[in-house]
Amino acid sequence: MINSLLTRVFGSRNERQLRQLNRLVTQINALEPTIEKLSDAELQAKTPEFKQRLAAGESLDKILPEAFAVCREASRRVLGMRHYDVQLIGGMVLHLGKIAEMRTGEGKTLVATLPVYLNALQGEGVHVVTVNDYLARRDAAQMGKLYNWLGLSVGVVYPGMPHSDKREAYGADITYGTNNEFGFDYLRDNMALSRADRYQRNLHYAIVDEVDSILIDEARTPLIISGPADESPELYIRVNRIVPQLTRQESEEGEGDFWIDEKGKQVHLSEAGMGHAEELLLQAGILENAEDGLYAAQNLSVVHHLNAALRAHAIYQRDVDYIVRDGEVVIVDEFTGRTLSGRRWSDGLHQAVEAKEGVPVQRENQTLASITFQNLFRMYKKLSGMTGTADTEAYEFQSIYGLEVVVIPTNRPTVRKDHPDQVFLNRKGKFNAVLADIEDCAKRGQPVLVGTTSIETSEMLSEHLRKAGVKHEVLNAKQHEREATIVANAGQPGAVTIATNMAGRGTDIVLGGSLESEYHALGEDATEDARFKIKTDWQRRHDAVKAAGGLHIIGTERHESRRIDNQLRGRAGRQGDPGSSRFYLSLEDNLMRIFASDWVQKAMRMMGMKEDDVIEDRLVSRQIEKAQRKVEAHNFDIRKNLLDFDDVNNDQRKVIYAQRDELLDAESVKDNVDGIRGDVIYDLVARFVPPNSVDEQWDLKGLEATLESELGMSLSLTDMVRAQEEIDAEQIAAKVQTAVDAHFAEKEAAIGADTMRALEKHVMLTVLDQGWKEHLAKMDYLRQGIYLRGYAQKQPKQEYKKEAFELFSEMLENVKREVINLLARVRIRSEEEVAELEEQERLQAQARLMASQFQHQDVGGYGADEEVEQMQGGNAPVPVSQVTRDEPKVGRNDPCPCGSGKKYKHCHGQLS
């Protein structure tokens, strides 16, 4: 009550911030008459002047009013667009490192030019992050004219571009690209073997377009660079033949072999199902021994494959979750409706879906490097974002990214009519009403955009409209190439456009059709008469559509997030245009079926509702919103859980990447090697001759053998001890250290100091990378099963932190030991041979990187759903998948493949 009283007196925090920023708008507007009088050359000279002022110690905030006024005037001259006052406010919010919520059609792309220009003056690089390559290239081309005119360089990064071009793009003052490309380039940079192979500078300032899509929707899944593992995909194909013979039960207590947890997207075998599955697997020869049982340790791999196959058949649907194109399974993004080419689900799910669809099954992958979007974007010194829908997720932006959401008022009042939801008993009644609404709009000449949640639904609606003779366009992942054309015409009188969520971002739907597209089709040589005729025809269509009520939005289903629903509604009513929206729902929709209260369905059936009966009731609408809040909270828990786990990885990642940077930058790593050598030799001697011990406890023969096998040194310690009457453990350690130092000095004298320095650097980088790769595999394995500790009354996150630290410490010790072992056993080569080998290794590393897979991994691989489920009382563990190897399997007691002569378990097997 007190809060509401204070808000009425002083205004909300959002209103207070807008009032403060309006004072700066007044200053900018006061400068406009002076700036307008400047010639082009004088206006362009402002950029070097600002740079000089910044170099002299002035702050960005001090020059902001004048810089914004210059950018506004330059935009008017170059682009023919002048920033509105509300756009100036949006630009200030972005400069302050906050999120600007701006409605569709308010010109977010133009708003970004203000803070981009201001912050690019520092010369440290500005990254403008978009959701797809098309928007990155489009915005770089359009806004690049303005930046170039003002004397700033612009680059755009995209997959597959030449190395030199990408380095140049990152060296520009302003760089456009997608969130995925910026993330993968960061990981690639931290796999490079020389500074010349790196792309990015320091992460200085980023503006994220459609910030909710990137930092929330896509934050559930990490970016991963992976290489193929050696395990054959044959088992996926064999298990796939068995799954159709298992029967689904309606609930956990029903009859059948398995039941589905739709909230967690998991499949669980019943007790009877386990027996039936064992029987089928034995018949197929996949299980070898009936007495061991399905969950015996040696059969965990089979359980992993069976679980993946069950999920592929029971949960993941073709033309909903994925499409099959050119013999490949391509994921469809559940939030945007776009295809995610090149991305693969983890935990064997993608292979299981490939087996289900009868396309070639690709091998599973081993992680080489990974990072989440949360930790990637939190590394920028300053981060900001813009979107049409952020306020519903303001708490998450603040708690995870430290970003405040500021709602920017529209330039003109919004007049869109949002009609109440209509709820039907079943899907048939709902779609009958949708079709009737579409036909009514088409007859009246009102354009209509129909939003669907899947490709399957969009094609079903399309078929019904085709039979009814209603002309329409379909925009989904299968027709993504025609997206720009379809969206450009979606505002034509009577146009009917059926679209998945992909139509929601990036391009405005203009009433009467896109005038710019028509001008572009005319060509640059078109006469003024031709352009006038085009403009006249467009104005007539524009007025006709406004008279018919503007763009009408039809939602065929509520999304899991209210924000996605608001995005769809926001397609209508841009810049004060008329428009309307309505959602049609049924009790059979996924959201209602899975998350809404049972009493809603029972009450409607008790009231005797029939197929075509409709309910418009606030109570039902509140229940729907309550269901959406449940899903949003569940998804937030998953993202927060993922971040908690990745924060552990991130601390380790920072240490490793900082060490790599130090190695790459160093002219010489001799001091590092000398320090490591001292530690390694001390630990080695202490294993056989413990400090402060007596000679009866010493194992001199073992120490001699280890020095011979690991360091290639022949040292007779037994004879040395016999020759001295008084000698202790510390003296032995000192003598071994002296001998090893002399051994290294001999190597250096033989091959030359410069060659030795280059070799030390190369070995340290290579061993560190190999150790980190193997450590990531262990961390994956640990993470996938850690939530099971909850059943032993232990806190999974604390257990994960503790064991991750132990693994990391072990990895660092192994890296130290391996560096010294390799350098001690180095063969003497000429400088020319060493240079040639280094170049070969660099080229091989680049080739491996080119062959790597770049994934935006499914969240299942992080155990997030499982732990959230476990914390909420779930009790069905998901089998842990096995870590795959890059090399053929070596037995613990076999000779180590490195050629040391030791058993594998005493040599490189310590890392496995």
UniProtKB/Swiss-Prot annotation:
Catalytic activity, as annotated: ATP + H2O + cellular proteinSide 1 = ADP + phosphate + cellular proteinSide 2
SUPFAM superfamilies: Helical scaffold and wing domains of SecA, P-loop containing nucleoside triphosphate hydrolases, Pre-protein crosslinking domain of SecA
InterPro entries for this protein: Helicase_ATP-bd (IPR014001), Helicase_C-like (IPR001650), P-loop_NTPase (IPR027417), SEC_C_motif (IPR004027), SecA (IPR000185), SecA_CS (IPR020937), SecA_DEAD (IPR011115), SecA_motor_DEAD (IPR014018)
SS bond partners: none
Gene3D superfamilies named in the record: Helical scaffold and wing domains of SecA, P-loop containing nucleotide triphosphate hydrolases, SecA, preprotein cross-linking domain
Positions with a binding annotation for ATP: 87, 105-109, 508
Keyword Ubl conjugation: no
Topology term for the membrane: Peripheral membrane protein
Residues where Zn(2+) binds: 896, 898, 907-908
Subunit (UniProt): Monomer and homodimer. Part of the essential Sec protein translocation apparatus which comprises SecA, SecYEG and auxiliary proteins SecDF-YajC and YidC.
Function: Part of the Sec protein translocase complex. Interacts with the SecYEG preprotein conducting channel. Has a central role in coupling the hydrolysis of ATP to the transfer of proteins into and across the cell membrane, serving both as a receptor for the preprotein-SecB complex and as an ATP-driven molecular motor driving the stepwise translocation of polypeptide chains across the membrane.
Protein name, UniProt field: Protein translocase subunit SecA
Organism whose genome encodes this protein: Xanthomonas axonopodis pv. citri (strain 306)
Gene that this sequence comes from: secA
